[in-house]
Structure formats: C-alpha cells, structure tokens
Amino acid sequence: MTQFASPVLHSLLDTDAYKLHMQQAVFHHYHDVHVAAEFRCRGDDLLGIYADAIREQVHAMQHLRLQEEEFQWLTGLPFFKPDYLNWLRDFRYNPEQVSVTNDNGKLNIRLTGPWLEVIMWEVPLLAVISELVHHYRSPEASVQLAMNTLEQKLADFTTLTAGLDMSRFHLMDFGTRRRFSRDVQEAIVKRLQQESWFVGTSNYDLARRLSLTPMGTQAHEWFQAHQQISPDLATSQRAALAAWLEEYPDQLGIALTDCITMDAFLRDFGVEFASRYQGLRHDSGDPVEWGEKAIAHYLKLGIDPQSKVLVFSDNLDLTKAIELYRHFSSRIKLSFGIGTRLTCDIPQVKPLNIVIKLVECNGKPVAKLSDSPGKTICHDKAFVRALRKAFDLPQIKKAS
C-alpha cells in the first residue's frame, strides 16, 4: 500500500447484514444472474482525485476471507444454511469486477459480474471511499471528537425524553456505509451498548465482536433485480416478496417499501404477504405520511398493527426518531436505524452522500423510483416509463 498506509478493511464481515442475507438468497435461487451497479455521489463533491487510492484498496480486498472463528459464529445464527456458509468460506473479492476512474474530477465506479459476487462490493467499498476521503480532508479529526459530539447528543436526548416511556423505543446502528472510519463506528457502537434502548447493529463484524444482534433484511437491489428476473414487470415486486419468503419463511421478515413507491408497494402487499412479513421499512418520502399509510393498510386487511413493526431508516437522527416515536408508539411497534448521523457526526466534517445502486440485471435496465424524486436511479428513460405504466403510476416529465 502506498497512498494509504494499510488496508482499510480487516474482515470480510465488515459489511451490512442484509448483504449476506441477500447473498444467501441469490446463492439458492439466482446463481446465473449477472448484474451491473454504479457509484453515485448525490452531493457536489469531486471525488475523482481519490481514484488511485480507492483502486489500491479494491485490490487489497481480494485478500479478505472468512476466518474460522467468523465461520463458526455464523453457523450459530438461525439465518444461514450450511451449503451457503461453506461457499462463503471460499469467497474472495475479485477486483476485476470493479472499474474505478477519474472523469475530469468526477469519481466513476462500475461493478459488473455475477450477482452472487457483485452483491458483496457495495457496503465495504462505500465505507472505504468514505474513510479515505475523510482521512485526506480531515486528518485532525479523531475518535475522541466523535465521542464528544455523541456524548452531547446523548445528554440532549436524555433531556428530550425525560418523562417519556421509552420501553418501546429501539435503536440500531446502520452506519457502516458512510462512517467516518472503522474506529469511529466501533467506538460509537460500544458507547451506545450502554443504553437500554440500543438493540443492535447492521455490521456483522461488530455484531460478532461486541456480542450484538445483527440487523438487516433486504435492500432495493433485491426488488430491482426482479424487474428483469420476473417474466412480467407488473408482478416483479410480488415475485421478489414471494422469493424472499421462500428463503426466509419465518425470519428476517421486514420488507422495504420504496423501490417503486409506497402506494405501488401496498397494492402488491396483500393479506398473505402482510400477515407473513413482520413489518415494513421506510427509506424515502415523508415518514409520518408513510407510517399512517402502513397502519391504515394493516387495519384495512384486518391485521392488528400492534403485531407488526415499522422500521424507520431514512436520514434519521435522534431527534427525528423521538418525534416519530411520540407520533406512532401507541399504535404499532417501532425500530429506528440511524447511520451517518451517528458514525460520521464530527464538527467540521461533511459526510459524503454516496450510494452504489444496481443499474442492470442480465444486461437489461432496472430502476429504483422511491418516494423521494431525488433518489430515482435509472439510465434508461424508456424503462422508467414502462415501470411507471406497469405499476399504474403517473408519468413524470424528467427521470434521472
């Protein structure tokens, strides 16, 4: 390593839980599916100057492998089957699947290959980019600065929640992808462990080492890929929901609702799906409006909302989480996943708004429409129109 003294990543499990959960489902159902994914910076940061350092880290990732103690720990979890874990034991990152270029200051990254393998790149690669950029931009920032900020926020949170029944408040760390650094995330999570309302982390490495519950089900890419895997676009979301239940019939039952839009999702989320899935996750659009729609939908189907859970994970901080808790906690179970506002909250440090999203499946376009227009991702405007038509959504003049 030259530009960065050593590899940023030290464990194959330093990733979000839903990546392994989805990878196992792909392993069992979609071995032959090929995909392409692309990096996008939603802000105005020109990150192309870091391309060489990122490429260096990508090559270092080929040396990561599942360690024996990690393998043994995974075998003790209820989610995984032996055939998948034995395959994962032999998994290695293939840097040839990753193209990293500096396009006049803009960072371009494209991932291509079997979905089974490409699925693993997104979270650790984003974490690497975030840590590299912050290392160069904010060399004076430290774990202690992050902890000082957290302690102040926790003190404010204690004041804010004084007299409030917090017995139904559950917070998870969702901060791997855009963390300031691996060390900051670990310190934050260790501190949060002291709070009775902290229930787990999406990071499998931290969950193992700190004896926490790993949290996560599926991401947008699960639904996006089914847009081309399913023979009929109009039923692709239902196909994705059904395939997930086939892999996980009675666990990991939180469904992400905004790959198309919440309204389109609820039209597909009939009584069987709503009964079998444990709850729903919010990731775009107005959270109060979304939660009200979810509760109304359960009631319409004759399902007691108190038997279900809503997971909020869109750009949350502690204050927003408490506002939502006050609004909904008497009517439905709740969990809150906070990412960047925990693991990259340091004075004078600007978090990166970066994502890697699926753009093709088996050589054909896929799209994420979402409930926030700025989060729409698709290169093919004709496919966006076809998707909106298939799901009975109004056409819009401009799609990014």
Curated annotation (Swiss-Prot):
Pathway(s) annotated for this protein in UniProt: Cofactor biosynthesis; NAD(+) biosynthesis; nicotinate D-ribonucleotide from nicotinate: step 1/1
GO annotation terms (biological process): NAD biosynthetic process via the salvage pathway
PTM per Swiss-Prot/TrEMBL: Transiently phosphorylated on a His residue during the reaction cycle. Phosphorylation strongly increases the affinity for substrates and increases the rate of nicotinate D-ribonucleotide production. Dephosphorylation regenerates the low-affinity form of the enzyme, leading to product release.
EC number: 6.3.4.21
Any one of the GO CC terms: cytosol
Recorded superkingdom: Bacteria
Residues modified to Phosphohistidine: 220
Pfam families per record: NAPRTase, NAPRTase_N
Catalytic activity: nicotinate + 5-phospho-alpha-D-ribose 1-diphosphate + ATP + H2O = nicotinate beta-D-ribonucleotide + ADP + phosphate + diphosphate
CDD domains: PncB_like (cd01401)
MF GO annotations: nicotinate phosphoribosyltransferase activity
Keywords: Ligase, Phosphoprotein, Pyridine nucleotide biosynthesis
EC primary class: ligase
Signal peptide: none
Annotated HAMAP family: NAPRTase
Function: Catalyzes the synthesis of beta-nicotinate D-ribonucleotide from nicotinate and 5-phospho-D-ribose 1-phosphate at the expense of ATP.
Similarity section: Belongs to the NAPRTase family.
Protein name: Nicotinate phosphoribosyltransferase
Organism for this UniProt entry: Escherichia fergusonii (strain ATCC 35469 / DSM 13698 / CCUG 18766 / IAM 14443 / JCM 21226 / LMG 7866 / NBRC 102419 / NCTC 12128 / CDC 0568-73)
